[in-house]
Each structure stands twice: as C-alpha cells, then as structure tokens.
A protein has these predicted regions:
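Glycine/small-residue-rich loop that forms an oxyanion/phosphate-binding "nest" at active or ligand-binding sites
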Residues: 84-108
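RNA substrate-binding interface of SAM-dependent RNA methyltransferases
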Residues: 60, 114-197
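Structured adenosyl-cofactor binding patch, chiefly the S-adenosyl-L-methionine
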Residues: 142-143, 162-171, 223-262
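Active-site/ligand-binding-proximal alpha/beta "capping" segment
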Residues: 193-243
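Amphipathic alpha-helical repeat scaffolds
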Residues: 51, 128-135, 244-250
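Boundary-proximal intrinsically disordered activation/regulatory segments immediately upstream
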Residues: 19-72, 155
Length: 262
C-alpha cells in the first residue's frame, strides 16, 4: 500500500485526499453538539455556522476558522488541515438545524469591539427569538447600522439559529451586550422608543443620530427601559378592522429603520 501511494503524483494524491470521507469521532460529535448551548460556547470561545452563504461571508471577514465540515468538496481556498469531508449522517449529528445544509463550520468567538456611540444605533430590549435577532442584524447591515446594543437578557448572538438568520451580516455589525438601562442613562444621543401608542413615525422629523429602542416580542419595551425613552413613536395601523394586535419585531424594525434613513 505504501508503494502504491508513493507511486501517485502530488496532484493525484491531493484529489484522493480531497474526496476521502472522514469519520467524525464520538468525542468530536459530542463537542461540536455541545456548542449548541450558550454556556459551552462561552467556555470554549467557539460557535458554529451552517450553510455555504453564511460560511463564505465569515471566511471573508476577520472571523477565525477552527474547522470546516462538508458533505462534498467546497471552499478550495481553505487549508486542507482545516476541513473534512464527512457523511450526511454525521452532519445531521452535529447540526443545530432540523434540515442541515451541506456544510458546518466552527469559528472562534472574536474579542468584543468597543461600542460605537455615534450615528444611528439600534438598542434591543430582551429580544428572545433567535430568528428575530438574526433578521434584525441583517436589516441593520442593509440600512448601514454599525452598532447594535443588546440587553443582557437578549438571545445570544452566537446561537446557531441567530448566526444562520443573519446570512453573514454578523460579520459586519458590531453587537454589544450591556446593562441597557445604564447605557441609555449615560448616552448623550436622543432616545426613541417604539410603542403601540406614540407619535406617528411617518410624520416625525427624525434625526440622523439617535438610539432607537425595540422591545420584547410579547411585552414590548420594559418599564425600566421606558423611563429612559425621550420620544415615543409608533407605526400606525391602516386596516379597516384593526384586528392585528402588533407587528413582528423584525418587521417593525425594518419600517422604523427605513424611516430614520429617509
């Protein structure tokens, strides 16, 4: 076997290695799966990203790749020692998704960046749904919002479903977790809050620099944070029956940010 292997050219050896399916050990499966939980992500300073689009975006950014697992040869630019071809059954074992994509990557959690306390800033008060947070970060990327401030109760940025929903925008928006009450009290920027009752956002003369607070999916902005709001704004309803209780927080964020950017 050694003789046969030595008889192959360098290029042929590369192609053989490229297409060999690696076995993922039980310990590897256990470790990668453990990163689905926040406490293990924090302990190991690692998180997972799934899908070609998301992984491509992260590879182009300053995120550092720990290892890449794919069911087919992809990402030729990634060093061979940092990637493995694995079976679909093994991918299902390590994926956080109900229907896994064809690749999963483990990245290092970067060091927190300083807060950019200028321009238009979005503050999130206790957003709990991973899909909502991911979509909101994608919206911030679209509208050029460089800084998002999250309350300490907001869902973890590196939750696999958050990362997936950002579609790579996680690499272009600075997200900081703080004591939101203290942050707002110490900021010199005007603070706007979204409520069911408030000034019609379409009729407001909105500033270029401000903090916009979006509240929890079920309860809105908490009383503690409400006390720091300087201006209450609302998205008016136009339906005749007026039966819809509220907008999804991500949908509301899209409308609000669009108005601030007009």
């Amino acid at each position: 076997m050694i003789f046969l292997w030595s008889g192959f050219s360098k290029d042929v050896k590369y192609l053989i290695q490229k297409y060999i399916i690696s076995m993922v050990s039980k310990n590897q499966i256990k470790f990668i799966s453990s990163l689905h939980l926040k406490k293990n992500r924090i302990a190991n300073q690692l998180f997972i990203a799934e899908g070609v689009k998301v992984i491509q975006e992260l590879l182009k950014s300053n995120f550092i790749l720990e290892h890449l697992y794919c069911t087919e040869p992809l990402f030729d630019a990634v060093q061979p020692n940092l990637k493995s071809i694995i079976s679909e059954s093994d991918l299902k074992k390590i994926s956080a998704l109900t229907t896994p994509n064809n690749c999963l990557a483990v990245f290092k959690i970067p060091t927190s960046m300083p807060i950019f306390d200028k321009g238009l800033i979005l503050a999130l008060d206790d957003i709990r749904d991973p899909g909502n947070l991911g979509t909101i970060l994608r919206l911030c990327d679209w509208f050029g919002i460089a800084q998002v401030i999250c309350s300490e109760q907001t869902v973890d940025l590196y939750n696999p479903k958050v990362v997936q929903a950002t579609m790579g925008s996680i690499s272009r928006v600075n997200v900081s977790y703080v004591n939101l009450k203290s942050y707002l009290q110490n900021s010199a920027l005007p603070i706007f809050g979204t409520f069911m009752e408030g000034s019609n956002v379409y009729k407001e003369n909105l500033p270029k620099e401000a903090i916009v607070v979006m509240g929890n999916e079920a309860n809105g902005i908490s009383q503690e944070i409400e006390n720091s709001i300087k201006k209450r704004i609302t998205i008016p309803r136009f339906g005749d029956l007026q039966l819809t209780e509220s907008l999804n927080v991500a949908a509301a964020t899209a409308i609000i940010l669009s108005e601030f950017r007009r």
